[in-house]
């Protein structure tokens, strides 16, 4: 019989909606308390999961003290992730935290240190890696028997333009890096392994409402030899995702319709080869985040989204921040040395 974990949900609006929708007994979860500063958000969450008003709180500590639970799911703004996680860890409760782990690398190191000291499972909800596009690309890169196997990828273009004119909670320095680039970097780590170095720049549109630069570009050299041309914007005039890989065996790319295509690498000057559509693999999406968190809590199987593993993502974010602020190439080994000095 499936063990059902009683979950306290801190932050139930916006990104806090998906866990409430997916946390069902069939998946091993049952919400028992809701925490939010917004009464409207609490009312909507209550209606979604069928909890009484007595299960709603405006204060996380009060909820943790009054409600018996088996885990905590935190979907508050990034700057609150560390203190809220520490609060849950003080009750020795496993935690699932929305991405990004923290608003800066020092906080991320402190976050992981607190998790290790508590000795309880903590995961970061990096849901992109559970998507069909991401899983299909991983298969094409890593499986030599795949019909669309790329071989070694020497170059990749990875661009996401986002129409996000309202800053909302993204008002702190490099918020777009810690909040959104963390997804892209998590994908790169899954596809190619760790990064070796990064050069980067930040910029803003004349019409931007953000107090800090919220657009970034970078050249990233992965340790396996792949070079990534990366760009991410929030001031875009049109939403667009560009994913294009050039491998020894062929090219893999995403078209505007969201289809993944593959063509073999020509060997003649200015040659071309016919493109074929690559079927997407089945992927769990956000349900996969919950499944891996559940397995970590109940079986002790550490997933790629554990806090310890996610520190690798935060290290890439720190590489970008440091490359932008110093105007130089930043090597991963520098970040490792900084992390070691803080532990």
Where are these regions (language model features)?
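Rossmann-fold dehydrogenase core element
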Residues: 110-127, 145-153
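Hydrophobic residues in well-ordered beta-strands that form the structural core
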Residues: 97-98, 122-124, 254
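C-terminal helix-rich "cap/oligomerization" subdomain common to oxidoreductases
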Residues: 1, 71-73, 294-343
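Predominantly a Rossmann-like dinucleotide-binding segment in NAD(P)-dependent oxidoreductases
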Residues: 128-209, 327
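Beta-loop-alpha module in the N-terminal Rossmann-like domain of NAD(P)-dependent dehydrogenases
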Residues: 19, 55-114
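Active-site loop of classical SDR/Rossmann-like NAD(P)-dependent oxidoreductases
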Residues: 37, 277-291, 305
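N-terminal Rossmann-like dinucleotide-binding module
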Residues: 1-51
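Contiguous beta-strand/loop segments that form the cofactor/metal-binding neighborhood of enzyme cores
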Residues: 185-259, 287-301, 336-343
